[in-house]
Amino acid sequence: LLSRFSNYEPKLLSKEDPFQRIALLSGPEPQRSLLEEKILRHFDGLPGKSLIVRGVAGDDVSVDKNTTILNGIDDLTLSKALSRNPIVYCRSGYSTLMDLLHLQHTRAVLIPTPGQTEQVYLGARFARMFGFTCIGQHMSLPVENEILDAQYPKLNGGNLLEESVDQLLSASSSKAI
C-alpha cells in the first residue's frame, strides 16, 4: 500500500496513547469548518479523550480537558495515535484510506467531502469491503457503541507494491532461459 506510514510498523508504535477517538479534518472551506463544528458538537460530553487535527495553519488550541485540538501533526505522532485503534472520523480521500489500511485500522467513520464524487465512491466501497461506516456530511454521526460493538474484518494491508514486484520478478525469472 502507498502510505505515508510505510516506514512504521502497525500496532507496535504506542502503548500510551489516550485517545478514544480522533478526527482528521481536511477539505475545502467552508466544508472543512462545517465538519469541524459538527465533530466538536458530537465529541462534547463523550467519555474519554478526543483528538481533533484541524489541518490548518496557526496555533494549536485545546477546548477542554477531554478534547485536544491540533492544527497539524507530524506523521510519527499521528501513526502512534492511530495505532491504538481509536474511532477515526475522517474524509474518504484516497491517501487517508491507504493510511488507515496500512495501520490495519478497523474503526472509521468516513465522511466524504460534499461534491467530491471520488470520495463518495471510495467511502461506499471501503464501507462494503472493510466494514467502515460511511455517512454524508449532512447526516448524524453514529453512536460510538455501535461502532465499538461491530465485528470488523481483519485488515491485511501488507505491502502490495512490494508483493507485486516480487511476483513479477519471480514470474519473469522462471521464463528466462
Predicted features and spans:
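Short acidic-hydrophobic, aromatic-tinged amphipathic segments that line or gate anion-handling sites
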Residues: 2, 68-73, 131-140
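Donor-nucleotide binding loops and adjacent catalytic segments primarily
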Residues: 5-87
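Short amphipathic alpha-helical segments
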Residues: 35-37, 63-65, 100-103, 121-123
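Short secondary-structure boundary/capping elements
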Residues: 73, 91-92, 160
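Short acidic active-site motifs
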Residues: 76-78, 96, 142, 164
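A donor-sugar binding/catalytic signature common to diverse glycosyltransferases
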Residues: 78-121
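Nucleotide-sugar donor-binding patch of glycosyltransferase catalytic domains
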Residues: 104-150
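C-terminal amphipathic helix plus adjacent low-complexity
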Residues: 144-177
